[in-house]
Amino acid sequence: MRGPDDTSGPVGPGPAEEPPSPPARPGITLTAAQRAVDAWISRFEEGYWPPLTNLARLVEEVGELARELNHRYGHKPKKAEEPDQDLGLELADILFVLLALANEQGIDLDARFAEVLEKYEVRDGERWTRRR
């Protein structure tokens, strides 16, 4: 699809409240994830949905995450019969739609995410107190 795979593992902060789920594919990159989404979508005649449909899907998935976070940490308790949702799966649903949207638009998220990390480092690297 877009460039060689990066074999380095994921980088980021540690778990906040719940331990991370084990990755389906250890060390998967955004490029590899985009390829996996492309392979899955390419199996179907309909192919990629239009950008505005994917935006609606993204908003729907973010709404599901917001609902769960509101139940856990906000002022809206769940109904007794309503089960807890898996936050990791809710986030992965959002990621899937983002990957599909990036693919449909021809965007290499590995490259763009590296640019965003650099942007944050330059813009915000001295904004907060560093850990010692």
Predicted regions and their residues:
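Flexible "arm" and connector segments at domain edges
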Residues: 1-91, 95-132
